[in-house]
Regions:
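Trafficking entry modules
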Residues: 133-136
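A structural signal for short, hydrophobic/glycine-enriched beta-strand patches
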Residues: 1-106
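A transmembrane-helix-recognition feature enriched in membrane-embedded lipid enzymes
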Residues: 101-131
Length: 136
């Protein structure tokens, strides 16, 4: 997709660095158009660790490419975090069958609440409250 649309590619989390690098090289994407970022430990962190950097580059629209079973939660979190900085997201699902694992509503709404709290306070409530296995 990045090559078809001649867009820069930002990989944040998901697959390990070696696998991401292999795919990028296999697909023939120019290295100067690709940024790998592994600071985040979860979906909220994928957005909060990058949103201000993306905005400072003048980006106002992002294609969010992720597995179809993760897209709804990613969009819920991303629309709050990126939206707070004036960045629009368009979700692009990647098929995951037969390995799809549906993410529950508790996880989705929990991460959405974390995103809203981060926008208001600049902090992740998980850091203050301790880890809750239901949100992972």
């Amino acid at each position: 997709l990045a090559r078809q649309l001649d867009l820069p590619l930002l990989v944040s989390g998901g697959s390990n660095r070696e696998y991401a690098t292999w795919i990028i090289e296999t697909e023939g994407l120019p290295a100067e158009r690709v940024q790998l970022d592994y600071r985040a430990r979860d979906t909220l962190g994928n957005f909060t660790s990058l949103v201000d950097e993306i905005r400072s580059r003048g980006v106002r629209h992002v294609l969010l490419v992720t597995s179809e079973d993760h897209l709804a939660r990613s969009m819920a979190v991303g629309q709050v975090v990126a939206g707070s900085r004036g960045i629009h997201l368009t979700g692009v699902p990647v098929a995951c069958a037969p390995d799809c694992r549906e993410e529950g509503m508790v996880k989705r709404w929990g991460d959405w609440l974390r995103a809203v709290t981060w926008v208001i306070t600049g902090r992740d409530i998980r850091d203050a409250a301790g880890p809750d296995p239901a949100w992972r």
